[in-house]
Amino acid sequence: YAQSGSSTFTVPLGGQDHKFRCGFKEKKRDLTVNAGTGGSVSPSGTNSYRVEKPISITATPDSGYEFAGWTVTQGDVTIENPGSPATTATLHNDNSTITANFKSGAELVFTVRASANKIVPMPTLGSGPYTVDYGDGKVAHEVNLRAPGYTQYPGSYHTYSADGEYTVTIKGPAATAFSFRGTRNSDLQYINPCPAKSILKNTIDISCVTSLEDAFSGMKSLESIECDLFESCKGRVTTCANIFDQCTNLHTIYNGLFEGFDKCTDFSLAFHYTALNSIPANTFRGCTSAVKFNSTFSAIPNILSIPAGLFDDCVNAKEFAFTFELLNISSVPERLFAKCVKATFFRGTFRQSHVTTVPGNVFENCRAIENVSSCFENCSWITSLPEMWNTSLYPQIKTYNAYAKNCNKASNYSAVPAAWK
């Protein structure tokens, strides 16, 4: 409350009785509440309120948007929690203005190849609802991406009127699932996969995901991943086994696709039988818990080299069976496995590859190795073999049959023990 003047008055009584009446009024100020693009507010507009009394305010994002905080644009009003869409504002001395801000919701952007009048399944995402821009001028709002009857396996579909390649944008909140492999039928077999060609962007929160095993396996349509697709779940995923296994047209992946996957233990068959043109240097950066790399890059004819330091952060790695089998690589980087001091299993690691140059220190510090059978089997162009039979360097090796089978062009082939050939 406030008074119009001083609260202390001097009144000469002059020997007479006097009666005084004091008047008071509420101290009010105006609060203007505005909404930025992408949402609405309550209350809205300009209203008068008593000072020092909290006023409830609420911001509601439109479909495809999310709340991005309150800002004071005029006056001395204070907001209890500027980051919450439902909070209180308190006026003090001045008329004030506040604004609710919104931002475009998280997005998943990818391209699809479509045939005219053919149903095209969308990728599986949970939670929602979502806004889907199909790239052909049609936009669907409040899309529920759960297939009827399959509460665990969502899905959505679209029909294009003409043949072509379309860029699809899905906007929405956090997801409870993430897969382009389609929905599951009653026999738990995946059906109706999304024919995604390139995945361009993902900022949808999939932090709930802990397994990416088989997530894209067998997707013949997939050609490239050009974004940090798993950024929001990288600290939670424990396995990536078979993730892109037999994606026979996948030729390009984001550099650092698995960077920071510090809980993931298994990358076996991750890129087996794909069309990768190269292995990005940061693919396994920060993968400190990785244990298995069995057949990770096997049977990829386009790979011609292995980046130096590829496994430098994989200090707990143990298994490298057939990791680079059937590759057209000509050389192996120095000290490729030197940081993998716990590694024990190198069966068929470079089997039937075209490698010619292998440095003697490729297995440096790997004193725990137990199995090197078929490690260089049928590497018929190799010019020199790492001396794994040196027991002072590798005292734990117990299995070594066919280690150097058909490697008779190696300059030190004659020094290889007969049981290793």
Predicted regions and their residues:
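Surface-exposed interfaces of beta-sheet-rich extracellular modules
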Residues: 1-8, 53-84
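Conserved "repeat-terminator" motif of extracellular CCP/Sushi domains
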Residues: 6-31, 82-106, 216, 244, ...
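Extracellular modular ligand-binding repeats in secreted and cell-surface proteins
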Residues: 13-16, 42-68, 91-94
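A short, solvent-exposed beta-strand micro-motif common in secreted/extracellular proteins
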Residues: 22, 54-62, 166-172
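N-terminal capping/linker segments that flank leucine-rich repeat
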Residues: 29, 101-214, 218-219, 229-234, ...
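Short, solvent-exposed loop/edge segments of extracellular or virion-exposed proteins
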Residues: 32-48, 113-115
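Acidic, Ser/Thr
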Residues: 36, 57-63, 123-125
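Core hydrophobic positions of leucine-rich repeats
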Residues: 176-187, 210-220, 226-230, 238-249, ...
